[in-house]
Amino acid sequence: MNSTISVKRPRRVLRVAGAGVLVTALSACGVSRVDEVSVKWPSFKSGTPVVLPSDPAQCPDLTGTYRAQGEFRSGDRETTALNDLRNFFLYTLDLPGMRDTLLPEWRSTPEATVALARVEGGWRVSAQDGQGARSTAQLPMLNGAQDPAALSGDANANRPDGVRRHTGCTQGRLWVSVRNDWRQYESMGVMRHVAIFRPDAGGLLVTVQRESDSIGMLPWYSNEGSVSQVWFARVAP
């Protein structure tokens, strides 16, 4: 039986009067399980990325062509990150190359597919929608290290630190951890995702946990989190 533990919580906004209380509120960290993998979440203020254990011998065989539209399995139905596998690689995981698609614009249709192929240093990700749009990128296997390709190219005024992405394998699963630090006017925050990939029932099972933290000038602090799991059917290439 596939399982995942949802950590979805109602939005919390904490208004605190003293700096000491604020530090206490922001220093909390937690541990969750994402598709049976233990994930430790450091305080977002520490700047420490979420990095899981990694062993290349534990990498799964993900080779195959899958439908871009999946079947919801469990967790938060309102989460849209996994509605389309190509868009998940592009927007949630910020995978370099996926955004280089030339016209026509990508359309999420039942005919759209995403193919994964093991190559030296990671996986090649190829997407096509059956109507002319296509893109190809590489997801590196870094054994827990940070992806250098995710830094300078993704930095801008609102995200001065760019994107920090780590990848690795554990428990027969591929994991990808992405951290986006942002600043806007008097506010700042962090968006973190941990995605777990593994073969399941002839297809591809993807589980993702999202944690979003932000702080403003009042001072106020908010946190939102969710977990969702979606299965993508394999199709003939």
Tell where the protein language model's regions lie, with residue ranges.
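Contiguous, well-ordered beta-strand patches that form the walls/edges
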Residues: D100-A201, W231-P237
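Small/flexible residues
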Residues: M1, R11-A17, V194, D200, ...
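Short, intrinsically disordered low-complexity segments
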Residues: K8-L14, S32, A133, V163, ...
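Amphipathic/hydrophobic helical signal segments and adjacent flexible N-terminal regions
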Residues: C29-R118, D200-P237
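Generic detector of low-complexity/intrinsically disordered segments
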Residues: V16, V23-T24, A28, M141, ...
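Sec-dependent bacterial lipoprotein signal peptides
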Residues: M1-C29
